[in-house]
């Protein structure tokens, strides 16, 4: 059995928004093949690795990825043919060196990530192992609590709330399968609640409902009603998580809540979150402050870090350097993990490991532009991260990840452990 790379082939395919993205196949001398499709975000952090787009307005409004495809089929393939796919760190280092830029702007983070993931999948296939076992070894056994985005706003919907995501977390379930069922039942109860109130039940990019609502906490009221109507207890069995994506509403040093006609300072934004946490069973807030509002983040952690999970997404962009700075500054206590923010599997695993060693949590996440690729489901189990964010229990691009986790839980059998209330290890006094 040889794990040496024999061929690398990239192509342009479509993501869940109908935009082009890159798919990569890596074929080994053993005949085993790994395939990966790279996701794409709508609200992207300024510090993310660069996603290479063509800029040719005559194709896909400039969003084509033929340059990234060419980079894989020519530069990367030439460099990696004959390379050992089982040596992931060396392979990723070779890709990073081949690019030679701080943000992967020469070859594109999408090109590099596609090859990085496809190589790992090919090596796993060669060893006859599922990806989670290949990456995580014998200790990979924790099934994550899903953060289910059941109401969308911000960049993921139009004419909705200022804030981007309103999620539920079934922490009280005994298994992933049960938690997923609870979430799906609440999702359907929410649809009826929204419909009965006379609002639209259209959905956003990630499958959550996106009605036009008068205030930013109106979705929380609807979600609370839906949880109870589905027969569950908010604040006991089900908690709420938020991703307001506040970088999108941050301008000239202030936070502009257009839905409410208010402009807030960093300190006032922190007080806004403190008030919401006191009124609703919120367990996690992601990007509660803008990506470069470091003082605001420190204040937020000092006010709420002992009670809830404070997740950095645009703030940290899966970047070890920014994560290390945030740990030292006591800003946030959790990192969102998005493979394409940093652009390689090795760098992603390094960020997760640093977070876990530092007493932080790591939440493995999709992007709003997704596909049938289920890599993140295996990744979250491989790293025992305990939390996954992959949308509503709707749309095949989201459901694919949930279904893969159901398969993994079944395969693990009695060894499978649902993270449940133990997922929030960064909070001094967890649930």
Curated annotation (Swiss-Prot):
The active site is at residues 206, 338. It holds the Pfam family Enolase_C. It catalyses: (2R)-2-phosphoglycerate = phosphoenolpyruvate + H2O. (2R)-2-phosphoglycerate binds at residues 164, 338, 367-368, 389. This is Enolase. Gene3D superfamilies: Enolase-like C-terminal domain, Enolase-like, N-terminal domain. It is found in: Cytoplasm; Secreted; Cell surface. Belongs to the enolase family. The lineage of its organism: Bacteria, Bacillati, Chloroflexota, Chloroflexia, Chloroflexales. The gene is eno. HAMAP family: Enolase. The keyword Lyase applies. Mg(2+) binds at residues 243, 286, 313. GO terms for cellular component: cell surface; extracellular region; phosphopyruvate hydratase complex. Pathway: Carbohydrate degradation; glycolysis; pyruvate from D-glyceraldehyde 3-phosphate: step 4/5. GO terms for molecular function: magnesium ion binding; phosphopyruvate hydratase activity. Binds a second Mg(2+) ion via substrate during catalysis. Keywords: Cytoplasm, Glycolysis, Lyase, Magnesium, Metal-binding, Secreted. It comes from Chloroflexus aggregans (strain MD-66 / DSM 9485).
């Amino acid at each position: 059995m040889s794990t040496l790379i024999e061929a690398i082939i990239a192509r342009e395919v479509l993501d869940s928004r109908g935009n082009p993205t890159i798919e990569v196949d890596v074929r080994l001398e053993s005949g085993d093949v790994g395939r990966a499709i790279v996701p794409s975000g709508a609200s992207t952090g300024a510090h993310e690795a660069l996603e290479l787009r063509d800029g040719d307005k005559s194709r896909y409004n400039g969003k084509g990825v033929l340059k990234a495809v060419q980079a894989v089929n020519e530069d990367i393939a030439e460099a990696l043919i004959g390379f050992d796919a089982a040596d992931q760190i060396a392979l990723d280092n070779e890709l990073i060196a081949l690019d030679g830029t701080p943000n992967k702007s020469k070859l594109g983070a999408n090109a590099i990530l596609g090859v990085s993931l496809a190589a790992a999948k090919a090596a796993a296939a060669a060893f006859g192992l599922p990806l989670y076992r290949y990456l995580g070894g014998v200790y990979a056994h924790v099934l994550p609590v899903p953060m289910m985005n059941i109401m969308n706003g911000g960049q993921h919907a139009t004419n909705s709330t200022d804030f981007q995501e309103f999620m539920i977390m079934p922490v009280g379930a005994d298994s992933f399968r049960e938690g997923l069922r609870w979430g799906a039942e609440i999702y359907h109860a929410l649809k009826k609640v929204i419909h009965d109130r006379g609002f639209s039940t259209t959905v956003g990019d990630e499958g959550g409902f996106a009605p036009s609502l008068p205030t930013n906490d109106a979705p929380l009221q609807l979600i609370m009603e839906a949880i109870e109507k589905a027969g569950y207890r908010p604040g006991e069995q089900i908690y709420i998580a938020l991703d307001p994506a506040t970088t999108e509403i941050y301008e000239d040093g202030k936070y502009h809540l257009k839905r409410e006609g208010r402009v807030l300072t960093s300190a006032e934004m922190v007080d806004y979150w403190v008030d919401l946490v006191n009124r609703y069973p919120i367990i996690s807030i992601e990007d509660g402050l803008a990506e470069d509002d470091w003082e605001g983040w420190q204040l937020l952690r000092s006010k709420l870090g002992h009670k809830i999970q404070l997740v950095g997404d645009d703030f940290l962009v899966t970047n070890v350097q920014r994560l290390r700075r945030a740990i030292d500054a006591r800003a946030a206590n959790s990192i969102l993990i998005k493979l394409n923010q940093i652009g390689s599997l090795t760098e992603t695993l390094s960020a997760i490991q640093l977070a876990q060693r530092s007493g932080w949590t790591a939440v493995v996440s999709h992007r709003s532009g997704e596909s049938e690729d289920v890599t993140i489901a295996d990744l979250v189990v491989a790293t025992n991260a305990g939390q996954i964010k992959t949308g509503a229990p709707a749309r095949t691009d989201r459901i694919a990840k949930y279904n893969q986790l159901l398969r993994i839980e079944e395969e693990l059998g009695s060894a499978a452990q649902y993270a449940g209330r133990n997922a929030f290890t960064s909070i001094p006094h967890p649930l």
